[in-house]
Amino acid sequence: MTFARRLRDAFIATLSLTCLHGALVSAHAQEPHKAQIDALRKAMEKYKDYKVAVRDLYLSTVGCVHYSGEKIPGSMEYAKGAMGVHFVNLTIKGPPDPMKPNVLIYEPVGRDLKLVAVEWLVPLTADTKEVPSLFGQRFMGPMEGHEPLIPKEFHHYDLHAWIFKDNPLGMFAPTNPKVNCKGSFALLESPTKMVHGPHQ
């Protein structure tokens, strides 16, 4: 075997081991987030019944929010799709808790509501020094409140997690093209305006 061939084989072997190590490290890094997501999903199971959510002070904003995919300079970019009907719990405060989202999101299905996602809203304050994060995901924002359901003066960050409905745009995308907002309570929103503050 020539020296050049031995060198080539050694390089390939080293590269293979490096890639394998990287894959193992990456898989290990993702495991805690998967475990957290599984725990979150289990904790949220009871809220598949929206009446239980209401009893726990998650109150409906009624409108089924969806977006056209319109892009407006200086505003958030939302892919065409829907979020759904938001149930907001104003009693949950403080730093975002991965097991206690302060928003539950439901999709109208016939005469019922199906829990599809959860969301964390974090107010932007004078003390905010960095973008909040959960599950290795940085929150979107800061942005104004989502009018007309939330006053525009409520500047905040948010993060969605589609834990009960597959989202082709990704688990943490804000909109989901598979969610339908039809009927009397469909609410087409314009992209939310971004505001000054620590960004992604």
Question: Which residue stretches match the model-derived regions?
Answer:
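Primary mode marks residue(s) on the alpha4-beta5-alpha5 output face of response regulator receiver
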Residues: 30-200
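Short, flexible helical or helix-coil boundary motifs
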Residues: 11-14, 18, 51
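C-terminal segment of classical bacterial N-terminal signal peptides
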Residues: 17-26
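Bacterial N-terminal signal peptides that target proteins for export
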Residues: 2-14
